[in-house]
Design a protein with these regions (language model features):
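Acidic (Asp/Glu)-rich catalytic clusters
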Residues: 18-26, 43-63, 93-97, 195-202
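Active-site acidic/histidine proton-transfer and metal-coordination neighborhood
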Residues: 12, 74-209
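Glycine-rich loops and low-complexity Gly/Arg-rich segments
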Residues: 31-34, 54-58, 87-91, 128-130
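N-terminal substrate-binding region of glycoside hydrolase catalytic domains
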Residues: 24-45, 66-77
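Hydrophobic faces of well-ordered beta-strands that scaffold small-molecule active sites
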Residues: 2-8, 28-32, 62-66, 103-105, ...
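Acidic-and-aromatic substrate-binding clefts and catalytic sites of carbohydrate-active enzymes
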Residues: 6-16, 34-47, 82, 110-113
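Membrane-targeting and insertion segments and their boundary/processing signals
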Residues: 4, 62-69, 161, 165-168
Length: 209
C-alpha cells in the first residue's frame, strides 16, 4: 500500500511547518530524521519519542526515517566497525519500539550524495538539482565541498555538515583502498549484522542508490 508523505527537515531547519504539510490533500505523514545526531551514535529512545510526539501532535505520522546514517568505519570495513554496527542495531531497536519501520540509508563513500548544481535553471525559470561528472572529475574535493556548501543559501544539508570539511582529505585517504567489490562486501556484512533486528521489528531498510 502506498502512503503519501512529505520530507520534513525538522522544526529548526524546515521553513515548511507540520501544520502546512497537514493541509496538503492526501498527505498522511512525513519522512524525517534526527539531524543533530552524528553518524555512528545511538539514537536515544527518548529523542525518538519526542520527535514522534511532535509529529503526531499535528495529526500526522512518521512514515519513515531518512536517514540513519552509517559511520564511515562500517563502509570502509575498519576494525572498529563492530561498535558502530552495535550502535546502529540499538537505534533500530529504539525505532522499532516506537513502530517506525521504514529506514532509508545510503552506503556511498565520503559524500552521502553529490550534485554539481543545486539551482540549475530550466527554460521555464524553475530550478532543479543537477549532476555533471565532468565537473566532478576536474575539481579538487575540498574546493567542491566549499562550493556546494556556499551555494546552499544558508540551509544546512545532511551529509554536508561544515565539520566534515575538516576531515574530507582524511576520508579520501581512508577510502583509497576500498574497491567497488570491497565496498559491496562491507555492505553485505552490515546487512547480515542488522538483519535479525530488522526481522524482529518488521523494519524495512530502503537503500538510496
Amino acid at each position: 500500500m502506498i502512503h503519501m508523505s512529505l520530507r520534513w527537515f525538522g522544526s529548526k531547519h524546515d521553513t515548511v511547518s507540520l501544520e502546512k504539510i497537514k493541509q496538503i490533500p492526501g498527505v498522511e505523514g512525513v519522512i524525517t530524521t534526527l539531524y543533530d545526531i552524528p553518524a555512528g551514535q545511538t539514537w536515544p529512545l527518548q529523542r525518538i519519542q519526542a520527535l514522534k510526539a511532535e509529529v503526531e501532535a499535528s495529526g500526522l505520522k512518521i512514515l519513515g526515517i531518512e536517514s540513519v546514517n552509517i559511520h564511515d568505519s562500517i563502509k570502509i570495513g575498519s576494525p572498529d566497525r563492530e561498535q558502530y554496527i552495535a550502535n546502529y542495531i540499538e537505534t533500530l531497536e529504539n525505532l522499532g519500539k516506537e513502530g517506525i519501520t521504514t529506514v532509508c540509508y545510503n552506503f556511498m563513500p565520503v559524500f552521502d550524495w553529490t550534485r554539481t548544481d543545486l539551482f540549475k535553471k530550466r527554460p521555464d525559470g524553475s530550478t532543479v538539482l543537477a549532476y555533471d561528472q565532468k565537473v566532478v572529475d576536474a575539481i579538487d574535493p575540498e574546493v567542491f565541498f566549499n562550493q556546494t556548501n556556499s551555494s546552499a543559501q544558508g540551509f544546512e544539508m545532511p551529509g554536508w555538515e561544515p565539520e566534515r570539511l575538516a576531515k574530507v582529505k582524511d576520508l579520501f585517504e581512508a577510502y583509497k583502498d576500498v574497491t567497488e567489490e570491497k565496498l559491496f562486501d562491507n555492505l553485505v556484512y552490515f546487512l547480515k549484522a542488522i538483519q535479525p533486528t530488522c526481522e524482529k521489528w518488521g523494519i524495512k531498510m530502503a537503500i538510496h542508490p
